[in-house]
């Protein structure tokens, strides 16, 4: 697969210029839910610039050739963050909401075009009934609460995952978000709920088997591209950079097919303590690596 889908020269730098000093900032974690600031209209009438980080840090300067097109993140550590503070696990999930939006803002500032966020895995159903119930309602509410903020910044939101067991209310809110942001092209955020890499591959395999059994597909002509075309979102590009927070070093069944040649970066911060500057640091490390894709 081509490393970068954009028609940019290696000398092009897709980062946004530094924001004016008085431009709105995010996040102010003194309240919950964290309030998203009112953003001034874009001079050209297009998507609004994301709020700058409260530190007023500026995205690093990376050329298009150095930048990952697709970043996948396992947002890990919410429960441990809460446990360390003597709080209920759900408090960690709640504090992670602002981080999702902050990282999305940072991805836009840096020039990343695809961001996949692991919000709820097919294995997470093994958690307590109480926590699963909370996570279903929480994901539904986060999508409802934040989709307008993301829309005005030019974000295209899409759900990636499987329907079985997933609450209908969650599916409905994701469908609304997807419809209202379908025309945006600043960045695509794949919000992965009830997602599992093995499940995705199994679903694709079943569909291919049905086509072959019906005589509509020659089994001898099945290739990697055939499988890709039958994944949940066939247009998702390969993952360039795979980030996991909390210090754990495993993929946890996320984007298995798409991450065949990804660069893994494991960061120690728990997700509620993470922010866009950590994403930028991961991208700088990625830019320093030599990706050979099997060549010498």
Curated annotation (Swiss-Prot):
It catalyses: (2Z,6E)-farnesyl diphosphate + 7 isopentenyl diphosphate = (2Z,6Z,10Z,14Z,18Z,22Z,26Z,30Z,34E)-decaprenyl diphosphate + 7 diphosphate; n isopentenyl diphosphate + (2E,6E)-farnesyl diphosphate = a di-trans,poly-cis-polyprenyl diphosphate + n diphosphate. Mg(2+) binds at residues 76, 263. GO terms for molecular function: ditrans,polycis-undecaprenyl-diphosphate synthase [(2E,6E)-farnesyl-diphosphate specific] activity; magnesium ion binding; manganese ion binding; Z-farnesyl diphosphate synthase activity. Its main location: membrane. The keyword Transmembrane does not apply. GO terms for cellular component: cytosol; plasma membrane. Transmembrane segments: none annotated. Substrate binds at residues 77-81, 89, 93, 121-123, 125, 127, 244, 250-252. Keywords: Cell membrane, Magnesium, Membrane, Metal-binding, Transferase. The active site is at 76, 124 (proton acceptor). It is found in: Cell membrane. InterPro entries: UPP_synth-like, UPP_synth-like_CS, UPP_synth-like_sf. It is an enzyme of class 2 (transferase). Residues 1-58 are annotated as: Disordered. Binds 2 magnesium ions per subunit. It holds the Pfam family Prenyltransf. Its EC number is 2.5.1.86, 2.5.1.87. GO terms for biological process: polyprenol biosynthetic process. Its cofactor is Mg(2+). NCBIfam families: PRK14827.1, PRK14829.1, uppS. Belongs to the UPP synthase family. Homodimer. HAMAP family: ISPT. Catalyzes the sequential condensation of isopentenyl diphosphate (IPP) in the cis configuration with (2Z,6E)-farnesyl diphosphate (Z-FPP or EZ-FPP) generating the 50 carbon product trans,polycis-decaprenyl diphosphate. When (2E,6E)-farnesyl diphosphate (E-FPP or EE-FPP) is used in vitro, both primary products decaprenyl diphosphate and (2E,6E,10E)-geranylgeranyl diphosphate (EEE-GGPP) are synthesized. M.tuberculosis does not synthesize (2E,6E,10Z)-geranylgeranyl diphosphate (EEZ-GGPP) and heptaprenyl diphosphate. This is Decaprenyl diphosphate synthase. It comes from Mycobacterium leprae (strain TN). The gene is uppS.
């Amino acid at each position: 697969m081509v490393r970068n889908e954009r028609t940019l020269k290696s000398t092009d730098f897709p980062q946004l210029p530094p924001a004016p000093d008085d431009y709105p900032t995010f996040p102010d974690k003194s309240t919950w839910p964290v309030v998203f600031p009112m953003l001034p209209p874009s001079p050209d009438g297009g998507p609004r610039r994301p709020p700058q980080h409260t530190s007023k840090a500026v995205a690093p300067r990376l050329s298009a050739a150095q930048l990952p097109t697709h970043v996948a993140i396992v947002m890990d550590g919410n429960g441990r963050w809460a446990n360390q503070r003597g709080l209920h696990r759900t408090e960690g999930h709640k504090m992670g909401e602002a981080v999702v939006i902050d990282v999305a803002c940072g991805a836009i500032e840096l020039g990343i075009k695809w961001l996949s966020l692991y919000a709820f895995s097919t294995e997470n159903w093994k958690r307590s009934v109480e926590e699963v119930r909370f996570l279903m309602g929480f994901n539904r509410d986060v999508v409802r609460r934040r989709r307008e903020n993301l829309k005005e910044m030019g974000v295209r939101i899409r759900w990636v995952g499987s329907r079985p067991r997933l609450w209908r209310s969650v599916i409905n809110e994701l469908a609304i978000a997807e419809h209202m942001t379908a025309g945006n092209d600043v960045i695509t955020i794949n919000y992965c709920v009830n997602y599992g890499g093995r499940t995705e591959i199994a679903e694709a395999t079943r569909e291919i088997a049905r086509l072959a059994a019906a005589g509509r597909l020659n089994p001898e002509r099945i290739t990697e591209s055939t499988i890709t075309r039958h994944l949940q979102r066939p247009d998702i590009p390969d993952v360039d950079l795979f980030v996991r927070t909390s210090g754990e070093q495993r993929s946890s069944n996320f984007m298995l097919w798409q991450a065949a040649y990804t660069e893994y970066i494991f960061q120690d911060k728990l997700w509620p303590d993470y922010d866009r500057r950590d994403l930028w640091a991961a991208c700088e490390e990625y830019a320093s690596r030599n990706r050979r894709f099997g060549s010498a």
